[in-house]
C-alpha cells in the first residue's frame, strides 16, 4: 500500500518523523539554514524519477546548509494541500518534482508570498514560483538511436505513465531518434495511467513483446520497473530511465537516460543562496549537464560510438532535438 500523504503539518511537524512525512537532518554548512521541503509523486527509493530528485535535493541542501524534509507518494489531488501545509509550517522553500506540481504551486503561492516554490518539468512562474524544465527529449533521442541500432524486429516499445507534456516529449524524442536511423521503424506506445503500479507496465510490455517488440524503453517512474522485469523474463533488451537502472536488468539493459537533479536543484537552491532567485521558467539540457545517457557495457562498441557521436552533436548544437508535446497516434 502506498504511503498516505499527511496533512496538517503545521500542527504536527517535528525534526525527525511525522506520520507519512520524512524529515531528513542534514549536516550544517555555510549558509542561511533555510528550511526546504520536497514533494514526490512516488517513493524516494524508487531507483528512478523520485530517487534522483531526493538525492539531488539532499546534495544541494548539504552544500548550502539547508534543512530538508520530504513527503513521498503525493497524490495529484493532495498537491495543493501538501504545498500549503509546508508553507504554513514555516518552510522557506517547497519543491514539487514533476509537471503536475506546477498549477498547484501557482495556486498556493498567492497565499504564501514569502515562501518560494520550485517545480521541475512545469510551465509555472510567478514572483515566488520558478520552474526548471529538463531537455529530456535530448537523452530520449539518443536512446532511440540506440534502440534502432539494436532491434532485429524493427519494432520498439515505449511505455509512459500519464501523457503529460514532460512525458510526451520523451516518447516523441525517442521515436525521432529511432527514425533518424530507420524511418520505417515501428514504435508501439502505451500509457499506464499510473506512476507506481509495476504490474500495469509489466502487462503493457508483455503485450508489446507478444506483438514482436524486442527493445522496450520506459519513462514511467517506479511503474516502469515492471516493463524492465517483463523484458528480462522475455530475454529482450530494455532501456532505463531517470536513474542508473542497470541493477534491475544487468544482462538486458542497453542504457539509462539520466536526469541529473543534483545539477538542476543546485542551480535552483543556489539562486536562493546568492539572492538571484527570479520567478521564471528555466531550461536545462545536455550542455548544462542536466540530462545525459549512461551507456551499458552490453552495447557493441560501434553502437556506443554512434550514440556518443549523437551526444556530442547535441551538446555542440549540431543536432537540435525537437521538443514536441503532441500526443502522436
Language model features: what each stretch is:
Residues 17-31:
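Sec-dependent signal peptide cleavage junction
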Residues 1-9:
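Positively charged n-region of N-terminal signal peptides that target proteins for export
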Residues 28-329:
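A residue-level marker of the well-folded mature domains of exported/periplasmic proteins
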Residues 9-10, 22, 297:
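N-terminal regions of proteins, emphasizing targeting and processing segments when present
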Residues 9-17:
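Hydrophobic core
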Amino acid at each position: 500500500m502506498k504511503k498516505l500523504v499527511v496533512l496538517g503539518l503545521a500542527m504536527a511537524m517535528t525534526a525527525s518523523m511525522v506520520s507519512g512525512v520524512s524529515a531528513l537532518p542534514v549536516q550544517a554548512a555555510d549558509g542561511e539554514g533555510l528550511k526546504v521541503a520536497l514533494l514526490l509523486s512516488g517513493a524516494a527509493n524508487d531507483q528512478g524519477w523520485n530517487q534522483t530528485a531526493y538525492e539531488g535535493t539532499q546534495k544541494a541542501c548539504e552544500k548550502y546548509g539547508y534543512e530538508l524534509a520530504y513527503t513521498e507518494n503525493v497524490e495529484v489531488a493532495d498537491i495543493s494541500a501538501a504545498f500549503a501545509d509546508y508553507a504554513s509550517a514555516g518552510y522557506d522553500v517547497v519543491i514539487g518534482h514533476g509537471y503536475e506540481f506546477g498549477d498547484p504551486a501557482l495556486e498556493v503561492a498567492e497565499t504564501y508570498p514569502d515562501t518560494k516554490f520550485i517545480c521541475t518539468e512545469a510551465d509555472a512562474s510567478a514572483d515566488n514560483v520558478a520552474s526548471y524544465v529538463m531537455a529530456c527529449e535530448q537523452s530520449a533521442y539518443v536512446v532511440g538511436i540506440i534502440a534502432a541500432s539494436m532491434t532485429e524486429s524493427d519494432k520498439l516499445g515505449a511505455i509512459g505513465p500519464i501523457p503529460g507534456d514532460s512525458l510526451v516529449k520523451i516518447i516523441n524524442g525517442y521515436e525521432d531518434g529511432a527514425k533518424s536511423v530507420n524511418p520505417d521503424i515501428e514504435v508501439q506506445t502505451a500509457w499506464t495511467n499510473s506512476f507506481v503500479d509495476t504490474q500495469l507496465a509489466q502487462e503493457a510490455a508483455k503485450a508489446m513483446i507478444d506483438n514482436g517488440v524486442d527493445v522496450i524503453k520506459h519513462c514511467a517512474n517506479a511503474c516502469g520497473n515492471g516493463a524492465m522485469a517483463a523484458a528480462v523474463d522475455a530475454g529482450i533488451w530494455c532501456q532505463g530511465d531517470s536513474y542508473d537502472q542497470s541493477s534491475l536488468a544487468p544482462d538486458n539493459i542497453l542504457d539509462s537516460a539520466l536526469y541529473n537533479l543534483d545539477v538542476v536543484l543546485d542551480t535552483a537552491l543556489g539562486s536562493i543562496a546568492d539572492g538571484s532567485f527570479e520567478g521564471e521558467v528555466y531550461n536545462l539540457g545536455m550542455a548544462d549537464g542536466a540530462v545525459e545517457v549512461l551507456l551499458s557495457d552490453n552495447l557493441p562498441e560501434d553502437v556506443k560510438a554512434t550514440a556518443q557521436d549523437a551526444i556530442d552533436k547535441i551538446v555542440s548544437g549540431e543536432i537540435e532535438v525537437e521538443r514536441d508535446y503532441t500526443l502522436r497516434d
